[in-house]
Regions:
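N-terminal strand-loop element at the rim of the active site
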Residues: 8-16, 20, 24, 28-72, ...
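A conserved mid-protein helix/loop that constitutes part of the nucleotide-sugar donor-binding site
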Residues: 19-24, 186, 190-209, 214, ...
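Short His-centered aromatic/hydrophobic patch
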Residues: 95-101, 119
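A short, active-site helix/loop in glycosyltransferases that binds the activated sugar's phosphate group
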Residues: 140-166, 173-175
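A short, well-ordered alpha-helix in the C-terminal region of glycosyltransferases
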Residues: 242, 313, 320, 327-341, ...
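Aromatic "clamp/platform" in nucleotide-sugar-dependent glycosyltransferases that forms part
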Residues: 248, 267
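Short hydrophobic beta-strand element within catalytic cores of glycosyltransferases
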Residues: 284-287, 297
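Conserved acidic donor-binding segment of nucleotide-sugar-dependent glycosyltransferases
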Residues: 299-300, 304-311, 320-325
Length: 359
């Protein structure tokens, strides 16, 4: 493949799933010999480090949270992106983010560069009238749309029309730190932000219904706005002595390696990175069918899928794995294969094949 100039547009380089994905993909693109230009739409402290060969630019202005200034910020961002696109003169553009996608599409209007966009949220997530309106009036102008799952692709066809160019490409996986000597504990582990959409309250409810297994603990990795509320829920259910809130941690892989079961109880997910990381650990995993799980889990083969909102079903699935070490081992062995499926070179090539399809 002839080397091309690729423009990558990201919300920022701050901590976030989009930023992590684009950092990984940008590094892979330059590894393949392409000239990569990375535009961050929001200036600020950088959580991720780009490959030194990636050209980077961010706006000289800082966004404000005031509602009265949001429209002005949008206009400034559109102008900034348009100016950078003209300067870079890319062969193709790739944008991630439900807020940034419409802005980038407007900025590219009249310039005619191929532009590929990707949402990173669940199709079930309501963004509000304004954002939904912006998506409806701009998305059809994209050269191509990247969907993380079949559920997301079907939704895009339904909303934007059956004639749009959609490709299903899952997220790539970060490098997992192997911990072969980790001591296993009777832990039911969950990883994620402590917020409503992550559904930790549902997991706590399900765990509280399990009796006769007092040696098992519920270990929650992550922090967020619902932490106090969840801690109160644990107290009311009288299971405080069996639940650990670990907060945000830098040793996630080591903690996963010590666990015995992983549960992702989310109400909605764009692409369940935490689930994939747990499978790669490897751990036997349980999730609701609300997170495009069927794209990742073959039910009863490499994980367990429970009907969304079925708390009793989730509790039963957890109990079944607690009582069956052989089943846990079998699911974990099969789950480990997710590493090969989401290997970054393989996923990186899928992105390149799509965003360079018109070359």
């Amino acid at each position: 493949m002839e080397n091309k100039r690729i423009c990558v547009i990201s919300p920022s380089l701050q901590m976030g799933g989009i930023e992590r994905q684009l950092t990984i993909l940008s590094a892979y693109f330059v590894k393949r010999g392409h000239d990569v230009h990375f535009i961050a739409c929001r200036a600020g402290k950088h959580f991720y480090e780009l490959d030194s060969r990636v050209h980077f630019v961010e706006p000289p202005f800082v966004h404000t949270a005031k509602a009265s200034s949001k429209l002005f910020s949008y206009v400034k961002t559109i102008s900034f992106i348009r100016k950078q696109i003209k300067r870079i003169n890319p062969d193709t553009i790739m944008v991630f983010g439900d807020i940034i996608n419409p802005i980038a599409l407007i900025a590219n209007k009249g310039l005619g560069y191929p532009i590929y966009i990707a949402d990173q949220i669940s199709p079930k997530q309501n963004l509000g009238r304004f954002k939904n309106f912006m998506k409806r009036i701009t998305y059809r102008s994209a050269t191509g749309i990247i969907a993380q799952s079949k559920m997301a692709a079907d939704y895009k066809y339904e909303v934007f029309g059956s004639d749009i160019n959609v490709r299903i490409i899952p997220n790539t996986m970060r490098d997992i730190v192997d911990c072969p000597n980790a001591e296993k504990h009777p832990w039911v582990v969950s990883l994620g932000r402590l917020s409503y959409e992550k559904g930790i309250d549902r997991l706590i409810d399900a765990f509280s219904r399990i009796s006769g297994h007092d040696d098992w603990r519920l270990v929650l990795i992550g922090d967020g706005p619902q932490r106090n509320q969840l801690e109160e829920q644990v107290k009311k259910l009288k299971i405080s002595d069996r639940v650990d809130f670990l907060g945000s941690r830098n040793d996630v892989d080591a903690l996963l390696a010590q666990g015995s079961i992983f549960v992702l109880p989310s109400r909605c997910e764009g692409f369940p990175n935490a689930l994939c990381e747990a499978m790669a650990s490897p751990l036997p995993c349980i999730t609701f069918d609300s997170v495009s799980a069927s794209d990742i889990i073959d039910n009863h083969i490499n994980g367990e899928i429970v009907r969304d909102g079925d708390i009793e079903g989730l509790s039963s699935a957890i109990l079944s794995l607690m009582d069956d070490e052989t089943k846990r081992t079998l699911l974990a062995v099969n789950a480990y294969k997710i590493r090969e499926r989401l290997e970054k070179n393989k996923i990186g090539d899928m992105f390149l094949d799509f965003i360079l399809e018109k070359m």
